[in-house]
Amino acid sequence: MPWRGSSITFMSALLVTDRDLASAAAAYFRDLQGRICSAFEALEESGTFTHRAWSRPEGHRLQGGGETRLMRGRVFEKVGVNVSHVWGTLQPQFKMQIPGAEESHGKFQACGISLVAHMHNPHVPAVHMNLRYLSTSRAWFGGGSDLTPTFPNAEDTAAFHDALRGACDSYRADAYREFKEACDKYFYLPHRQEPRGVGGIFFDQLASSDPSADFAFVRAVGEAFLGVFPQIVARRKDTPFDAAAREQLLVKRGRYVEFNLVYDRGTQFGFGTDADPEAYLMSLPPLVRW
């Protein structure tokens, strides 16, 4: 049966008390996916997203599914915007890594949206955005967004950070500083001793005494991304470039691949949950060079 998003079946499997919050999060992620794809298609003259729904068969240790949307074009060389909502039992080696999973005997539920865009023009930065809700015996939000330019542009970097700062300031006064520092620490390649890009924000295990405020912040991050990144693309997509710049872009993508396959928690989570490989490996660029 094709995956059709949240339903009473999903609700019967929730492991948290506030079922309405989990349902609302899944619904928001699907809505945001649609609006982001529409904004990106407006920047790509002849490109449209392909849609592929996936679901786990009855009797599998995991249930649920998701939708992978992918577009390849002149502006967006490859962009994927995925949503998923899955539940079931974690493999034993992941129980100790996921908070509350041992207490829930490996039972978990997760929903989220994940986006990665690799651009054709070296002057348009690559971007990543992820928002998620996860529950075991505990429940929390996580996510963030970061920019990876080949040729850093001060105007674009400032606009991106200002948008995310606005979302953070609506949550609490020290949130931007905390989440920016976490991003700089997380998106770093220790073996090369260099950052992946120019940063952004990153947060995990966000579970305050007010879950509705946490969810409002997650929505604010989604709206901030939608407001700023299409503007950056529109400004830079027609900037002239030569073969040397394109070569540098491909080498920069190599750093992206190294990080995502070696360090990225989302990729490791995908490996551990038997999720759709096309979804959690969506972040890999179409062409790369070392």
Indicate where each model-derived feature is located.
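Internal mixed beta-strand/loop scaffold within catalytic domains of large alpha/beta enzymes
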Residues: 65-143
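A generic structural motif
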Residues: 21, 121, 137, 147-153, ...
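Compact, glycine/acidic-enriched structural inserts
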Residues: 137-179
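Long, charged, mostly alpha-helical binding arms that flank functional sites
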Residues: 167-217, 232-234
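Long, contiguous binding/interaction regions
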Residues: 267-290
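Glycine-rich, often proline-containing surface loops adjacent to acidic residues and nearby aromatics
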Residues: 80, 109-111, 139-148, 194-209, ...
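Gly/Pro-rich turn-and-neighbor structural signature
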Residues: 17-99, 210-262
